[in-house]
């Protein structure tokens, strides 16, 4: 009985021992096939080498899904700052974070415990990246203070996030017909350079494709909240290329132009009206005031165009400056008319004296002919001593007419009436112009722009 019990225990011990040997042998065989050693995990360096190193078989020159469906790249941008908008060169400057996301199944992993890996920017050269460029870019630069402003993140499922900080100068064709009450639309176009739509497609991120930093302000514009997102697919001789775009609406603020252009020109026009209250005999004062205001207005008009491109159409500021210059010049011409009318009495009296002199000479000649022609003496007169002399009509200088003062007063009153009418007509005409001007550009055309 005792011996049977010992045999049973020995058999059980041998069975368990054989099972353990088999398990260890199986684990070793499995680990050797998978390239792992028992009780050993990969280091980060070994893992990256295995994932995208030379021994991994990963080729950064070949896109994901090679010879398969195109790679979908979702993009979004975060605007850090919106720089100067320049009318002369028609461009704007912007600082952004550009983020691109795509899926590369070759970078999927399960051997590493982390759900995602934030890698050094130097690893960007080891993976495939979309060949994105900005179609309307005029200048750009990367940022490397204190290190390269780039981010590379790879998720377990092979999703890649590539973020980079850029400062861009982008072209922005502007319509300045309503300047400085205009609303400009500036675009940003993201396009593939070498991959056609058979290989690569850009799309906007569905959640927050374009984000703006809080408190972002521009010196002369208000950045509208509504932004238009769309596609701008390009067709070239080399193929059809994917392109996406965003349109920014910038409404110009008038504060600067009111202070620097509109108010000074308005005051110059009002100053030109002061001559209507100056005595018409003070010619030096009125002429000097008129010429000064004309020259000042000309300088002001030239200054308003200095910061603008030489376009072929008329801008709103051009109309304002032209009308102001017209009013100032008209005020100078008004004094010329006043001075001319006030001096007309002298010419009138001179002509009147000439006419009277001619009439008197004709009367004397006619009278002398009548008195002496009957005696056959013609124009000769016989004196008491018997001598004959030729009768010559008297030609005394005419005396000024008795109503000369009345005539002078009549013309002076006409000149004064011109000044009196101008004092009311000029401000009224300028007021009517202002009403039409501001209604047209601030209400009618402004609404048309917003409808578009």
From Swiss-Prot:
Coiled-coil boundaries: none
A single BP term in Gene Ontology: cellular response to ethanol
Binding site for Zn(2+): 226, 228, 249
Subcellular location: Postsynaptic cell membrane; Synapse; Cell membrane; Cell projection
GO cellular component: cell projection; chloride channel complex; GABA-ergic synapse; glycinergic synapse; intracellular membrane-bounded organelle; postsynaptic specialization membrane
Positions bearing carbohydrate: 72, 103
Transmembrane regions listed in the UniProt entry: 257-278, 284-304, 316-336, 421-441
Gene3D superfamilies: Neurotransmitter-gated ion-channel ligand-binding domain, Neurotransmitter-gated ion-channel transmembrane domain
Tissues in which the protein is found: Detected in the retina inner plexiform layer (at protein level). Detected in neonate retina. Detected in brain. Detected in spinal cord, with higher levels in the dorsal horn.
Membrane topology: Multi-pass membrane protein
Disulfide bonding pattern of the chain: 172-186, 232-243
Reaction catalysis annotation: chloride(in) = chloride(out)
Predominant localisation class: membrane
Pfam families to which the protein is assigned, alphabetical: Neur_chan_LBD, Neur_chan_memb
Entry keyword annotation includes Cell membrane: yes
Entries under InterPro entries matching the protein: GABAA/Glycine_rcpt (IPR006028), Glycine_rcpt_A (IPR008127), Glycine_rcpt_A2 (IPR008129), Neur_chan_lig-bd (IPR006202), Neur_chan_lig-bd_sf (IPR036734), Neur_channel (IPR006201), Neuro-gated_channel_TM_sf (IPR036719), Neuro_actylchol_rec (IPR038050)
Disruption phenotype: Loss of glycine-induced currents in cortical neurons from 17 dpc embryos. Still, mutant mice are born at the expected Mendelian rate, are healthy and fertile. No effect on glycine-induced currents in cortical neurons from seven day old mice. Baseline nociception is not changed, but mutant mice show increased hyperalgesia in response to mechanical stimuli during later stages of inflammation caused by zymosan injection. Knockout mice show impaired learnig, short- and long-term memory deficits, and impaired long-term potentiation in the prefrontal cortex.
Other remarks in the entry: The alpha subunit binds strychnine.
Family, per entry: Belongs to the ligand-gated ion channel (TC 1.A.9) family. Glycine receptor (TC 1.A.9.3) subfamily. GLRA2 sub-subfamily.
Protein name as annotated: Glycine receptor subunit alpha-2
Gene designation: Glra2
